[in-house]
Amino acid sequence: MGLPTLVALDRGASVLATDYYEAALDFTRHNAGQNGLPEPETALLNWRAPDRDLKVFDLVFAADVLYEESSVRALADLVPSLLAPDGEALFADPGRRYEPLFRELMQENGFRFETEETTVEVDGLDRDVTVLVHRIRRR
């Protein structure tokens, strides 16, 4: 839980980790401490009803969040308001059903995609997982 947050902290970034569930944020803070990392700033965030006073960021990243249509639509509405004018979003997706819809909606909102495909070994699976990493920027 919160692996992208831990990697960003390890690389010295200032991080705001968000989730719908407080328990997920607790676990992210715990994992940071267990790995000798500073505690990240955290906030509850409901993609479907976000606080409109959210900060603007140079980088927004997410992993494996494109799993249902309503989430994809909410994220496509939310991400543009979170990004600074020259900011970028990085989304990692293991080929979820609604990934093409997210790409379409973001492109309709004036964003362009650069996508890299990578293969990841996952403990407990007898096959590798292909992950698409999308770098998303305004046109």
Where are these regions (language model features)?
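S-adenosylmethionine-dependent methyltransferases
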Residues: M1-R139
